[in-house]
Design a protein with these regions (language model features):
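N-terminal glycine-rich phosphate-binding loop and ensuing alpha1 helix
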Residues: 1-30
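A conserved hydrophobic position in a structured secondary element of the catalytic/binding core
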Residues: 30-31, 82, 162, 209
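Conserved core of the sugar-phosphate nucleotidyltransferase
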Residues: 82-173
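Hydrophobic/aromatic residues located in beta-strands of well-ordered beta-sheets
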Residues: 26-28, 72, 105, 133, ...
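Short phosphate-binding loop-to-helix
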Residues: 27, 33-92
Length: 226
């Protein structure tokens, strides 16, 4: 419920997604009474989950029966600067997948500052030659002894597009071992054998996980850099 500019972070995120005009329906699913009451008061579409889930994807799976779409987006509430073009690219992944082979897609952005590579609050992803995720980690992957950018490092952005079936299977599986260690929900899909198509976006984005992130985001907002 921290403020970004004059609005809460979750409200900024909701309005960014709403203003993209890409989705048939937008809904916040939360287990926080504070967030529920805040969004309900301003007439935003919000559902309350009484169940304590380990991650947002599990909450969405719980409420997925309320939505008709075969493709469901999970946009984490701490992504107020989400890139519309990145969302369009994720939609196009499924539009172009005529054989329905891709079950999950997500966003990544290049890391240009080595401090971010070594920052455990930033989730890194390594990919194969077809842009499918090999692994996600809070650690530096791949590790470089040179302590500088010597590889195309990518930061994972907290946005997923999923087919309904994969979402349900994710929830049925329950928390997996590597997911528990890293505290990264995307790893559960990998441990289940799913391939995650990663889409690159060059748009500057800040996931607000810490007070320092919030300060940086407010500064960029004031200077209208984002």
């Amino acid at each position: 419920m921290k403020k970004l500019g004059r609005k809460s972070v979750i409200r900024q995120t909701y309005e960014s997604v709403l203003n993209s005009k890409l989705f048939d329906e937008i809904c916040v699913i939360t287990d926080s009474k504070l967030i529920y009451n805040h969004l309900n008061k301003i007439n935003f579409n919000v559902l309350y989950s009484n169940t304590q889930h380990d991650c947002g994807t599990d909450r969405i799976a719980e409420m997925s029966h309320k939505f008709d779409s075969d493709i469901i987006f999970n946009i984490q509430g701490d992504e107020p600067f989400i890139d519309k073009n990145g969302l369009i690219e994720l939609i196009n992944v499924f539009k172009n997948d005529i054989n329905n082979k891709i079950q999950i897609a997500s966003l990544m952005t290049p890391i240009l500052d080595y401090k971010e590579v070594s920052n455990p609050n930033i989730v890194k992803v390594i990919i194969d030659n077809e842009n499918f995720a090999i692994y996600f980690s809070r650690h530096s992957i791949p590790y470089s002894q040179e302590k500088k950018i010597s590889y195309n490092h990518f930061k994972h952005i907290g946005v997923y597009a999923l087919r309904r079936k994969s979402l349900k299977n994710f929830s049925k599986q329950g928390k997996t071992s590597l997911e528990s260690i890293e505290k990264i929900e995307a790893i559960r899909f990998l441990e289940m054998g799913y391939k995650i198509k990663m889409v690159k976006t060059n748009k500057t984005t800040i996931g607000i996980d810490t007070f320092e992130d919030l300060e940086k985001a407010n500064d960029l907002l004031k200077r209208k850099i984002i």
